[in-house]
Swiss-Prot record:
Organism: Mycolicibacterium gilvum (strain PYR-GCK)
SUPFAM superfamilies according to UniProt: dsRNA-binding domain-like (SSF54768), Ribosomal protein S5 domain 2-like (SSF54211)
Ranges of compositional bias, category Basic and acidic residues: 15-41
InterPro entries attached to this UniProt entry: Ribosomal_Su5_D2-typ_SF, Ribosomal_uS5, Ribosomal_uS5_bac-type, Ribosomal_uS5_C, Ribosomal_uS5_N, Ribosomal_uS5_N_CS, Ribsml_uS5_D2-typ_fold_subgr
Gene name per UniProt: rpsE
Family listed: Belongs to the universal ribosomal protein uS5 family.
Record flagged with keyword Ribonucleoprotein: yes
Protein name: Small ribosomal subunit protein uS5
PROSITE patterns hit by this protein: RIBOSOMAL_S5 (PS00585), S5_DSRBD (PS50881)
Tagged with keyword Protein biosynthesis: no
Matching HAMAP family: Ribosomal_uS5_B
Length: 222
């Protein structure tokens, strides 16, 4: 009887130890891997432009799968495009997001708009971008708008001059953004002062944006 009571108390102590330590419950308290993934995803803007169902003819019939065109950006000048394919829609979107993050590139912006007029081409898609004054907004179509918003462009005039296929429009928009150059780069290449290269309004808008960023940083540290 004493041995049985001792064994029972030992089991109770071991069980209590697990309860005190939290055991598997600690993963739930920390949020698990899902919590970390949610926090990481919240730092980026994700836009699913289009989802298509495709099929492959095999000996036994047809095999269906889904493709997803995804735009990912931080809203501060970084953006990327990804194309995912899987048997299920969520898996295709996840693959597209992963590829888009691998394709990140920096977009030069001044005061929330593009630095100069530019035209990008990809396959049959042609997209033209023009700078716009503050308050104009993003004047663009659906596929082009998704890229510009994820890149952090707030004021721009965009026009699609070629194919209206979403994939072509997205890649043409990316090609246009990759052609953008900062005024310092153009001035250095031409050997001219920056005032002779960039319009006065653009330089003034950049100074105002930098002043706002500095004031916001000071308020955040205060």
């Amino acid at each position: 009887m004493a041995e049985q009571a001792g064994a029972g108390s030992a089991q109770d102590n071991r069980g209590g130890g697990r309860d005190d330590r939290g055991g598997r419950g600690r993963r739930d308290d920390r949020g698990g891997r899902g919590g970390r993934d949610d926090r990481e995803k919240s730092n980026y803007l994700e836009r699913v432009v289009t989802i298509n169902r495709v099929s492959k003819v095999v000996k036994g019939g047809r095999r269906f799968s889904f493709t997803a065109l995804v735009i990912v950006g931080d809203g501060k000048g970084m953006v990327g495009v990804g194309y995912g394919k899987a048997k299920e829609v969520p898996a295709a979107i996840a693959k597209g997001v992963e590829e888009a993050r691998k394709n990140f590139f920096r977009v030069p912006l001044i005061g929330g708009t593009v630095t100069h007029p530019v035209q990008g081409e990809a396959a049959a898609g042609v997209v033209m971008l023009r700078p716009a004054s503050p308050g104009t907004g993003v004047i663009a179509g659906g596929a082009c708008r998704a890229v510009l918003e994820c890149a952090g462009v707030h004021d721009v005039l965009a026009k699609s001059l070629g194919s209206d296929n979403a994939i072509n429009v997205v890649h043409a928009t990316v090609a246009a953004l990759k052609l953008l150059q900062r005024p310092e780069e153009v001035a250095a290449r031409r050997g001219l002062p920056i005032e002779d290269v960039a319009p006065a309004g653009m330089l003034r808008a950049r100074r105002e944006a930098e002043a706002l960023a500095v004031s916001a940083a000071r308020e955040g540290t205060a």
